[in-house]
């Protein structure tokens, strides 16, 4: 861009260096201003699609300005003007389509952009099902009439906590979700610390999912930072940081699990909500997560929900076994068969597959890309009612 602008704006060869320097300075200042605008204005206040449409429209305007100023109009290139007009019309149509677009599964109650994606809350036409979406991908499902979750992982995280620890007095939840799990544990007498990186989900939880943040201690920061800074010790650590189609890889490394281990009592347990498969050729993430946990903890159990949702339980204690069976009395009736399957279906990962994940080498996003695409596709098809 700079060489082209230098050629257009330079009148004599003596001023080439000065003009290039000016253009470079302007470009640098523009990059800084653009980054600040995107980070602090466009991302929080405008959907990503609107931002893309505005950028395209601005580029079309710049083309028009160039021809008006430097080419003295469109007489020499008559085909440019229709192209500019067509581009502006397309931008207008795209903006209109985005404005009226809504999920096909029901009524949109809430829409807001955040630094971590577009957040939406959608009710089904009957009003019996409420969805929390991030970038159009389902993050949680709720029955507002029964005041119960409609996701298996909600019941499994709570159930595994009680099954593997006899009396969880202090619990750390890395990932708030919409607040269902921490609130349940708090009502049962546990002291709860919650670490959540996205403040936007707190607003959603309070408005649409009955979240009462006074029942736990909320820390709005990255989970890894909290682990390194905290001096507290916990009976249970729940890692539920799944977002979109995957979990943050920096929370799935050996170094991160070592930080968690330092925050855990000797008989404490770590409960993880993850997604993946165990079939040959598709088990890199699950096998690697198992190996990485075993590099830090003495006991690891895997509960496979058979539909991609997998739960890991790890402890510094040797010979970890459940103290009791899961209580199904609080599970939504529609989910009891699925929760029972996830509880009873304990499996072992293939020891020949996967690697120990570290901060220095964590290629999960590459090797697990096919699974993540599948998860994203299934979420998208569900949102379209297929």
Q: Which role fits each region the language model picked out?
A:
Residues 13-24:
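Loop-to-transmembrane helix entry/capping segments in MFS-fold secondary transporters
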Residues 152-275, 279-289, 296:
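The AdoMet/dcAdoMet-binding core of the Class I SAM-like
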Residues 11-15, 69-78:
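Membrane-interface helix-boundary motifs at transmembrane edges
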Residues 1-11:
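Intracellular juxtamembrane helix-capping segments at the cytosolic ends
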């Amino acid at each position: 861009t700079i060489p082209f602008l230098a050629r257009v704006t330079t009148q004599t060869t003596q001023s080439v260096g000065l003009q290039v320097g000016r253009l470079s300075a302007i470009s640098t200042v523009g990059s800084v201003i653009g980054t600040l605008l995107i980070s602090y204005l466009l991302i929080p206040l405008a959907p990503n699609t609107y931002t893309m449409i505005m950028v395209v429209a601005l580029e079309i305007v710049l083309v028009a300005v160039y021809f008006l100023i430097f080419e003295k109009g469109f007489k020499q290139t008559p085909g440019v003007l229709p192209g500019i007009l067509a581009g502006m019309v397309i931008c207008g149509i795209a903006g209109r389509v985005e404005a009226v677009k809504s999920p096909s599964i029901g009524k949109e109650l809430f829409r807001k952009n955040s630094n971590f994606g577009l957040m939406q809350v959608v009710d089904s036409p009957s009003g019996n099902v409420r969805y929390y979406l991030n970038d159009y991908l389902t993050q949680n499902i709720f029955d507002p009439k029964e005041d119960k979750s409609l996701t298996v992982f909600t019941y499994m995280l709570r159930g595994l906590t009680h099954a593997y620890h006899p009396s969880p007095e202090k619990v750390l939840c890395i990932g708030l979700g919409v607040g269902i799990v921490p609130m349940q544990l708090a009502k049962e007498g546990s002291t709860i610390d919650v670490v959540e990186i996205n403040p936007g989900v707190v607003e959603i939880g309070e408005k649409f999912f009955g979240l009462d943040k006074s029942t736990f201690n909320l820390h709005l920061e990255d989970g890894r930072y909290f682990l390194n800074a905290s001096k507290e010790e916990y009976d249970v650590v729940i890692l539920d940081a799944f977002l979109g189609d995957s979990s943050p890889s920096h929370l799935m490394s050996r170094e991160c699990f070592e930080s968690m281990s330092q925050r855990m009592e000797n008989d404490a347990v770590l409960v993880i909500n993850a997604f993946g498969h165990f079939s040959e050729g598709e088990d890199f993430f699950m096998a690697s997560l198992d190996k990485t946990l075993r590099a830090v903890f003495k006991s690891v159990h895997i509960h496979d929900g058979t539909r991609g949702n997998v739960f890991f339980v790890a402890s510094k204690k040797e010979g970890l076994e459940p103290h009791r069976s899961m209580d199904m009395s609080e599970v939504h009736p529609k989910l009891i068969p699925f929760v029972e399957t996830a509880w009873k279906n304990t499996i072992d990962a293939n020891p020949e597959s996967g690697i120990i994940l570290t901060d220095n080498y964590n290629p999960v996003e590459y090797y697990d890309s096919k699974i993540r695409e599948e998860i994203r596709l299934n979420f998208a098809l569900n949102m379209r009612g297929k």
